[in-house]
């Protein structure tokens, strides 16, 4: 019997009356458990009659084949509806919302208030400055949990683990997350110009920058912006409009280069530690470390640096900073005056750079001038304005014998 498309559509609508909705919902409730993972922004389901061993009792992402399988079961059960109708019901407000981070934390037993589980985990890494490492790791770890649980919180700190290859840095880092959260871990740098990388700030908990060795100065400038980024504004492939997503990711890095920092202006976001040894085989007490971190967070623990702590951090980070030749040569050929000095000069940055360029074989350009000015400010050389309005710096211009004496000759 021939029927036109209009007739077929009307017949389908007739089949999909409200009774069909109730039949379908009853069937879904008795055969499946659906939830919407708000971190990954995806539907997940559990089939109560699952036959595949790896998925028995476990939820998994809803795929196109999942809809097809559900549609087939509905037809076999005598519930007549279209595949699009099934998709519309499943991908609606029907599934419960699920946050894997709050779900895990809320099921933990409260911390006993005594046992330092985070400190015990930190002790599995032995460093050249153990006190700095333990303090910085505690701050970063609590900040990581804050970033995961609190919509307004942002972890501005980046742990950097330095050692030669083969110490197990990446393995140790990967084990910071419990098995339930392993899919929220990622290896790789975060490119602020890459939309997918930006979205990962919302869908991942730890981003391990294993390629930190190869980061250029321009890369680090973009990385600093990303580290402090509060939210992600992008349009996903299947969305019709640009949306704002909560930032949840925290950064950690591993490097084989001791001098891994480059910014002369300060590196207070970075927490570098020189690793002597790592124990990545002892089981991690996930319940303990996360219950303690949650208690510290709720108790108002300060997981960021401020005031004198920042000054101490910057002094520590100097041991891991690659100094620019302009900065190093400034301290070779000039110094700050002492009260008893009589041969004091007031010189503009360009004049200072001219001498450095001659003796230090440094190219004179805008970048060199900028680096020199930053260096003069960093070491707090006194300044004044001359009659022409240019800035001059108070220096002692070292003579050859003084320069050679500085080299130990």
Question: Where do the model's predicted regions map?
Answer:
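Long, low-complexity, charged/polar intrinsically disordered regions in eukaryotic proteins
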Residues: 282-317
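AAA+/SF3 P-loop NTPase mechanochemical coupling elements
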Residues: 196-202, 236-254
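A short helix-turn-beta junction within AAA+ P-loop NTPase domains corresponding to the substrate/partner-engaging
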Residues: 261-280
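N-terminal nucleic-acid engagement/recognition segments and initiation subdomains in replication
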Residues: 1-116, 131, 360-363, 394-409
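P-loop NTPase catalytic core of nucleic-acid-dependent motor ATPases
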Residues: 92-202
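DNA transaction DNA-binding modules
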Residues: 304-409
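Conserved catalytic/switch belt of AAA+ P-loop NTPases
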Residues: 220-243
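Conserved AAA+/SF3 P-loop NTPase catalytic/coupling segment centered on the Walker-B
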Residues: 204-228, 261-266
